[in-house]
Amino acid sequence: MAEKDNIIELRGVTKNFEDTCALDNIDLEIRNGEFLTLLGPSGCGKTTILRLISGFEKPDAGVITLKGQRMDDAPPEARQVNTVFQNYALFPHMSVRENVGFGLRMQRRPKDEIARRVHDALRMVHLEAHADRRPRQLSGGQQQRVAIARAVVNNPLVLLLDEPFSALDYKLRKQMQLEIKHLQRQLGITFVFVTHDQEEAFAMSDRVVVMNDGKIEQIGSPQEIYEEPANLYVARFVGEINILNAVIAANHGDGLYDAVIEGVTFPIRSQRTFAPGDKVNVLLRPEDLRVYTLTEDRPAGPHLTGRIEESVYKGATVDLIVTLSDGRRLMAAEFFNEDDVDINYNPGETVTVSWVDGWEVVLPDGEA
């Protein structure tokens, strides 16, 4: 995405709830027209950010701006921001059509405009046929989709979504991810999405904000977050990761080092600066590893030796658990090819493990 003006900025924002620090001196810039996801475990502060942006909470310190204007004390109704929360908050006495059009009626929009926009919103969430039903006649997933339609129909500058797909089944959740992303591109407005689901965040987002304990750990594109984690917390949170302890043996310059892993010297690459003797962690995703049996031709170069502990068929991939000589376990993922007999491994079989040069991520030892 090209660089754009910021529509929302949080500068030095802190929020406490009694003795708990929900947000600790947060700085965050949200770009106009982007799909930004706040990703993290329960209690990390991601929903608190949504509530501060929407005006349902006030910061204890710091500044929040919308289009350059301070919004610290502005009530929710004065902000061009709509929110979809986990609880649906639908009016039980109104039909689906009336629920979706409620905000437009409060704005005294023309009836034909209301009818058109409500119809378009319901079509987006595949509920046109349910327009005259009451919320109690809908499933939980359908009620959540009504809430999304009600928020989108007002064409806000910013739409905030707090885990809106939590009530949906797997298939519908996948479908709604595509629909919401498509809708966001159509409308061109900023979406701020909250989830604890890494796959969901990566599928929908232009940028992802990884949070932990009231702080931001990393901001970047899904690819940056996955392939270039800033620290061990991010690396562990966004997927399976293998962590190998290593010691720098030599610095050859231009980011090329020799590192000793399990008594074997490997070439590694990093933009960070290390000195011989430094302890580091070498991070490798399961799909980065290459596993070879002793009867296979393998590329020349250093390798680790271990035994197959488990082989798990997952359809598109086969996950291998390899136990090294020191007892450390590695997970490798190989794409399944039914014509490739070499992908069939036996428990206890001796194998060698290596990886493509430069695919590793290197972090200082002890970096959280």
From Swiss-Prot:
Residue positions binding ATP: 40-47
Annotated ranges, domain ABC transporter: 8-238
Higher taxonomy: Bacteria, Pseudomonadati, Thermodesulfobacteriota, Desulfovibrionia, Desulfovibrionales
Family per record: Belongs to the ABC transporter superfamily. Spermidine/putrescine importer (TC 3.A.1.11.1) family.
Record-level Gene Ontology MF annotations: ABC-type putrescine transporter activity; ATP binding; ATP hydrolysis activity
Gene name in the database record: potA
Assembly and oligomerization: The complex is composed of two ATP-binding proteins (PotA), two transmembrane proteins (PotB and PotC) and a solute-binding protein (PotD).
Official protein name in the record: Spermidine/putrescine import ATP-binding protein PotA
Keywords: ATP-binding, Cell inner membrane, Cell membrane, Membrane, Nucleotide-binding, Translocase, Transport
